Amino acid sequence: MNTIKKFGLSLLFIICLIIALPFQSCEPEVIDVTECDTCIVAYKPNIYIYPQNNIQLTVNLGFPLGGEIITSIPEYGTGWNVFVDTTGLIDNKYSFLFYESIQPDIWQNNYGWITKKSELESFFRKNMADYGFRGKEIDDFIDYWIPRLQNYSFYSIYPQTAKLIEFVIKLDFSKEPDNLLRLFYVIKGHNQLQDKLIEPTIDNFKREGYYTTEWGVILK
């Protein structure tokens, strides 16, 4: 009887181990960016913050799959601790929080748009507005990026939205916004016209309450 009981317990243990193994293998692998040949830089993400009331705020970035900040304004240190007024001005000086980071290249390239170099500005003005960006947010993007996207005749543009970005670069606030818009563009230049891409559905963003917007670019 004792032998049967011991056998049953051993069998139960083995079954539990077999069940547990697949779940353990689903844990994300954290990559050391200093030894990562496939990591890539996210250039110039700008974070705009619009509180309903003046607020003292801590903002933190995290890299669940591995990664690190390589530059920031104001200095990131162990996290931004900033004062933001109702106009979005940060520490009475900055219009946005700026950083650049390196992390694993797992960005999507299944859907997006192909655009001529000559039409880039009009494309981004409309596309960013469709996603929910406004005014200075769009102007800042245009002023910085259009002069830097002049080397190719055509550009493939792949949007990366909040769900995917959050998987790679987490953005946390001591007081969470009511609404958060995060959009990165993966941009790849070509000298020949490429096949048309599957265009994504663009969700409507509500600029209501206390909200935050962020854009950035990954060049390929």
Model-based region annotation:
Residues 27-220:
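Protease-labile, long low-complexity intrinsically disordered regions enriched in Pro/Ser/Thr
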Residues 11-20:
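Bacterial N-terminal signal peptides
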Residues 22-25:
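C-terminal motif of bacterial Sec signal peptides marking the signal peptidase cleavage site
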